């Protein structure tokens, strides 16, 4: 069996993984994911047609959203889980198909059949056919390289939207227009009548809905847990057993804190859960100790030393070592064969974390990795509350430039560029960050400017929305019509599909001169890249000295 996956930055030789994913995903799982995406596109064909007929089904919307999320890099490695998801996709497809066919016949007096693509009809009961189908329906679905590139770019952007919409939905925030675009975009990726220009327009529309979805999630998080506050976050440990919670799901964080209170078990965040330390609703828990460790790719060593159980709420999961595999718990859309999965919450109920809590009680306290504190909680509400101070610092020359260094971290040695770039920035610059890219520089002693820390961490990757809001409000304060006229530069590190969504969102907002690295996406063809360069002046990283000179000159 073979595979072809190039959806992440670390793909082999920046061309594609064909034997096994660098992420650890085996070829059989990669092919099952391709089949699931194929059937989801078939579901979205009916859901998109249905909306034109007044047919909506929230169960269908949620199924597509959640299953797209399951295919994001480092979320789910479980062969059996994807087999089950494909089987369920047939049932969901039949459910929406029946509703749409009925309405179509009522309106037009004939069946929809002559318009239906193969992904809306394909069916098999033989699981072996799932695997062979995956090789057939993978990433090269068209003979046109640029069409393929744009279809993949659109699909990955929609995956990121689905991930953010999933988190908002968990907190009872939803937007039907987001679901509608999700279906429209997926259906478009199998429509051979669409031209390159049509797909470019859809990619830009994906950026629009990326902004809308991040705004929705910001609303969900802040209404549920308050606006993040500037916070000194502990990175040391205490002498109690603990649970390490990783991923992005704040609802899981809330329920874990509630259920561990008074048990003698401490809670620590890891990776992208670090920003949870800045939310007012979570600060009231005395057993919420702080953050343990660094970015996702270092988890093999750090999970080993944590000693207690680890709860993976979303990505990024690295295939666990046998030495601690029995301490890994997954939940939500995360999956890995051979580890304990905590089921989804019932309507109106909390998830049951009793098993992981009892496990923690039997474990030793975490081994100390480091001591001290790091700053966090500088989302848009906190920064804009001192906007006058920031504006004054710019006007009097204390702050010469802001550099947005949001995005993802990863294994590649080339990412040391971001550490060196942060160190090399002049003392009159401020770094605005969100996402796990922060771990490349958030523990450096970069000082402050008039009491404003030189690294302002807005939060998780979805909190890139905060950076956009900050830039827009600064443009208003300086009475600028074009956001590109601000002393703000963008040096973005990408890794997976949510970063694609963030990038498309920035492009939709008209942001130009984005530096992107550490490599350009393998799925972007030369012609598509030329469009991005010509229209948005996007460029790859080169080296610290060269990029720094250009960025400080506003180039």
Curated annotation (Swiss-Prot):
Pfam families, A to Z: Prismane (PF03063)
Catalyzed reactions: A + NH4(+) + H2O = hydroxylamine + AH2 + H(+)
Cofactors required: [4Fe-4S] cluster; hybrid [4Fe-2O-2S] cluster
Localization annotation: Cytoplasm
EC number: 1.7.99.1
Free-text function comment from the UniProt entry: Catalyzes the reduction of hydroxylamine to form NH(3) and H(2)O.
InterPro entries: HCP/CODH, Hydroxylam_reduct, Prismane-like_a/b-sand, Prismane-like_sf, Prismane_a-bundle
Listed name of the protein: Hydroxylamine reductase
Signal peptide stretch: none
Gene encoding the protein: hcp
Keywords (A to Z) from UniProt: 4Fe-4S, Cytoplasm, Iron, Iron-sulfur, Metal-binding, Oxidoreductase
One function term, GO molecular function aspect: metal ion binding
One GO CC term, this protein: cytoplasm
Cofactor note: Binds 1 [4Fe-4S] cluster. Binds 1 hybrid [4Fe-2O-2S] cluster.
Entry-annotated residues carrying Cysteine persulfide: 408
Species annotation: Natranaerobius thermophilus (strain ATCC BAA-1301 / DSM 18059 / JW/NM-WN-LF)
Primary location: cytoplasm
Domain of life of the source: Bacteria
Family (UniProt): Belongs to the HCP family.
